[in-house]
């Protein structure tokens, strides 16, 4: 083993940017020995390849998360201080949770159960900011615009419509959006009139641009303090929330 470590360490030193002295270089025979020892070790312990791949993926995710956190800091005002964004929960919150969501996203439907539960448990301490982020087709975009238009009729109207839309599965053609809006207590005629306001479509476009800046490639996507949680990972969401509440 000592011979193996000595040869292997020399091999790594040779591969570095600084060349070692000539008398420290490996001979051809030593190089062959290193290759054979490494080969035999891998053949006898093939699981090390899987371990290496897992570690490689972990490091890649860490780099991606760090890059996204840097982007979050750069886009702080657009994320947290846009008055156009719908909000739910505490007016003076201890914790703010941001969710990028799409009404056609089945995982958003799962995550909505956690959102509702948190609002029931910590509605006086937690505030949600919803980023309407339609990425699943034209009907997703129409539903997002409809929800933002309905918000002009009141935050409670928006909340009812938001959860009605998110619980609906399948396609969202115009007729179905209107039906769901009516069920949620929305004045559909007024909603449709407000949907023609360029300010609302501009808001949706701005959120899309923000999502691209943050490299949000799927929904749901949560920002909880310094923790980014892609997907409907209930355990990760709850852990991040508890860290913020108890931090």
Region spans (language model):
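C-terminal cap of thioredoxin/glutaredoxin-like
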Residues: 4-5, 24-36, 179-247
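Hydrophobic face of amphipathic alpha-helices
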Residues: 22-53, 57
């Amino acid at each position: 083993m000592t011979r193996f470590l000595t040869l292997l360490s020399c091999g790594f030193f040779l591969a570095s940017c600084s060349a070692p002295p000539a008398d420290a270089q490996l001979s051809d025979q030593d190089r062959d020995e290193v290759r054979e020892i490494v080969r035999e070790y891998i053949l006898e312990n093939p699981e090390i390849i899987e371990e290496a791949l897992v570690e490689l993926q972990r490091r890649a995710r860490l780099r991606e998360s760090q890059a996204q956190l840097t982007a979050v800091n750069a886009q702080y005002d657009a994320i947290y201080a846009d008055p156009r964004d719908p909000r739910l929960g505490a007016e003076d919150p201890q914790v703010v949770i941001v969710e990028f969501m799409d009404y056609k996203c089945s995982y958003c439907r799962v995550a909505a159960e956690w959102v509702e539960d948190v609002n029931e448990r910590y509605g006086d301490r937690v505030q949600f900011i919803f980023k309407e982020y339609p990425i699943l087709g034209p009907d997703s975009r129409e539903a997002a615009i409809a929800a933002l238009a309905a918000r002009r009729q009141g935050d409670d109207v928006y909340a009812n419509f938001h959860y009605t839309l998110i619980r609906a599965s399948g396609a969202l053609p115009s007729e179905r959006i209107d039906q769901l809006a009516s069920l949620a207590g929305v004045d559909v005629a007024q909603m449709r009139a407000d949907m023609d306001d360029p300010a609302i479509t501009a808001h949706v476009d701005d959120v899309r641009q923000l999502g691209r800046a943050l490299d949000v490639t799927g929904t749901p996507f949560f920002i909880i303090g310094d923790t980014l949680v892609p997907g409907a990972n209930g355990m990760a969401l709850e852990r991040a929330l508890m860290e913020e509440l108890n931090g």
